[in-house]
Every structure is written in structure tokens, then in C-alpha cells.
């Protein structure tokens, strides 16, 4: 398993994200994930820059591969526009770009006032959107008339030498089967060996990528407080992450999440062995590339500590 760094667009502004990308490269991380949001999950996180602009900055600051973790190409932004943005990102990174896609959350997609579809319809829309992406990346003038989208005489003039790989996220059986069908890889946030096996059994041959969060700090008690203050939404059950429409709603729901609940799944504090245990859960589940996000302000401490102690265990070759 390779170890990458997960850039949190919800927690940092664009200049800080570019700086973290630079630090991640210096520390030996394999590649980058970057989240694509219109809103953060709560006001405490406090950021949400336009990911496509940030990717341009990262491309100039580093030589790392960047994957959106993940983009919704179905509601807020038409898939023809995502195809254009992704093609430009692949050109400016000289091919070091992957487009991670998923069926999205109302938190980000409701802002244009469109109806928020049910889960099954969202997957149907995602499948058609990926069809449009691949069509436009073929080059030339293209049109598409489908159930959910129309494209009229569209041509992307600046195309990379090879189309970007599409990494499809999914957390349930239907989404994972779709990922195996239409994707060049699969993205998840859970070290669930059964679901990863399902992806493989359904014919998924590309890499399984995953994202996880840690709060590395010299003070475990302070790290627990930081993780709970900034990311309580990670513990919300069921489909709440997909259907709650605003940061205020997430803040209300997160009042039910205790500090202990967050600390059960987010390793907090200075114990490197505890952090490695979490990483190994993903490796043992069959994850090929794991992207780690450091929660909170102690970014320098994280990179300085992980670069010599943890990163070489995974990225030495």
C-alpha cells in the first residue's frame, strides 16, 4: 500500500492547500487527494475554495499526482463543464491528474436550487455523466442526448495525451458495482474488506484508493478536542451526509456526536504506533493507496514527524 496526503478544502484556503501539497511532496508522500466542495461540513472548518483553481496552483508548486476526492459531475456543474475542467487539469499537471467522482451531497449540490434526487437516480446520473466525460475526451465535436443531460456540438480543444483516469467512489453495494463497471479505480473512506472484495468480484481492476483522517499532536487530550471540534460530522450515520443541505444542519446533527465517538475512529495524539495501526487496517482490507488528512493546525509537526517515521514504511521503493 502506498501512502498519500489528503488535502482538505473544507479546512484550509487555497494558498495553505498549495503549501501543504509542497510539504507533502518534501515528506515523501506518494500522491495527493483534494476534496471538492462548495460548502464545508460546518462553519468551524471554515473554508471551501474552488478546487479547479487550487489544482492549478498545486501543479506549479509540485510534481505530484492529484486526484479529486471526489467531484460530483451531476447537479451543480454539468458534466460537460467537468470534462473541460478535468482535461485542463490533466494538461497543466502533465498527466498527473485523476478525476475522482461520486454521486454527491445535497450540502454542495442544492445551491443552484435544483431538486435533490434519490440515491438510485443519482447513481444513474453519475453513470451518464461519466459517459459524457469519456465522450468529450475523445476529441472532436460531440453531442449527447440522454435521459438526464444534453450536450450540443461541444469540443474540448486542450486535451491531455491520455484521458484522465476516473476513480469512482461508493459506500454501498450498488455504488461499488457501478464503480467496477464504469471506473478506472474505486475510492472509499472505509477499510471494509468485504466491499473491496465486491469491487474486485464485479470486475473492478483498477486501484482501490481510500481517505482517512488523523490528528497527530504531542497532547492526546488536545488532539481529541481538536478532532471533535472540527470533524464531528464524520460520525453521522446512514444517509445524513448525503441529504442534509447546509452546514447549519450538520452542526445541529453533530451535537449528538461525542468526543469519545470521534476518538474511536480518528487516531489522536503522539503515539505513532496507534496511527500505524489505523493505516494497517486499510492495508489489510485491500486498499492500494491510502490518503491521510491531518486534522487541525499542527501541520508542520505532522509532516516533520511522519516523514522519517511512517512514510518510508510505505513509500520506500
Model-based region annotation:
Residues 1-317:
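Active-site-adjacent structural elements that line small-molecule/cofactor binding pockets in enzymes
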Amino acid at each position: 500500500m502506498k501512502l498519500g496526503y489528503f488535502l482538505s478544502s473544507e479546512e484550509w484556503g487555497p494558498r495553505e492547500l498549495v503549501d501543504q501539497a509542497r510539504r507533502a511532496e518534501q515528506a515523501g508522500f506518494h500522491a495527493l487527494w483534494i476534496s471538492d466542495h462548495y460548502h464545508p461540513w460546518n462553519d468551524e472548518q471554515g473554508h471551501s475554495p474552488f478546487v479547479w483553481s487550487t489544482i492549478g496552483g498545486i501543479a506549479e508548486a509540485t510534481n505530484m499526482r492529484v486526484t479529486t476526492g471526489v467531484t460530483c459531475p451531476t447537479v451543480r456543474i454539468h458534466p460537460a463543464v467537468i470534462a473541460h475542467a478535468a482535461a485542463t487539469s490533466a494538461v497543466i499537471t502533465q498527466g498527473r491528474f485523476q478525476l475522482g467522482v461520486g454521486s454527491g451531497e445535497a450540502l454542495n449540490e442544492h445551491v443552484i436550487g435544483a431538486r435533490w434526487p434519490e440515491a438510485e437516480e443519482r447513481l444513474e446520473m453519475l453513470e451518464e455523466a461519466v459517459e459524457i466525460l469519456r465522450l468529450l475526451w475523445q476529441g472532436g465535436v460531440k453531442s449527447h442526448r440522454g435521459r438526464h443531460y444534453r450536450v450540443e456540438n461541444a469540443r474540448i480543444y486542450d486535451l491531455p495525451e491520455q484521458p484522465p483516469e476516473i476513480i469512482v467512489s461508493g459506500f454501498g453495494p450498488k455504488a461499488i458495482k457501478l464503480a467496477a463497471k464504469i471506473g478506472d479505480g474505486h475510492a472509499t473512506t472505509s477499510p471494509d474488506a468485504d466491499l473491496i472484495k465486491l469491487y474486485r468480484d464485479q470486475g473492478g481492476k483498477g486501484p482501490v484508493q481510500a481517505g482517512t483522517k488523523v490528528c497527530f499532536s504531542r497532547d492526546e487530550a488536545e488532539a481529541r478536542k481538536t478532532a471533535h471540534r472540527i470533524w464531528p460530522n464524520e460520525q453521522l450515520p446512514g444517509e445524513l451526509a448525503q441529504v442534509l443541505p447546509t452546514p447549519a444542519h450538520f452542526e445541529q446533527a453533530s451535537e449528538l456526536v461525542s468526543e469519545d465517538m470521534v476518538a474511536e475512529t480518528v487516531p489522536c495524539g503522539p503515539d505513532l504506533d496507534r496511527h500505524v495501526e489505523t493505516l494497517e487496517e486499510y492495508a489489510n482490507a485491500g486498499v492500494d493507496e491510502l490518503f491521510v488528512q491531518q486534522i487541525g493546525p499542527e501541520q508542520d509537526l505532522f509532516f516533520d514527524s511522519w516523514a522519517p517515521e511512517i512514510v518510508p514504511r510505505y513509500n520506500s521503493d
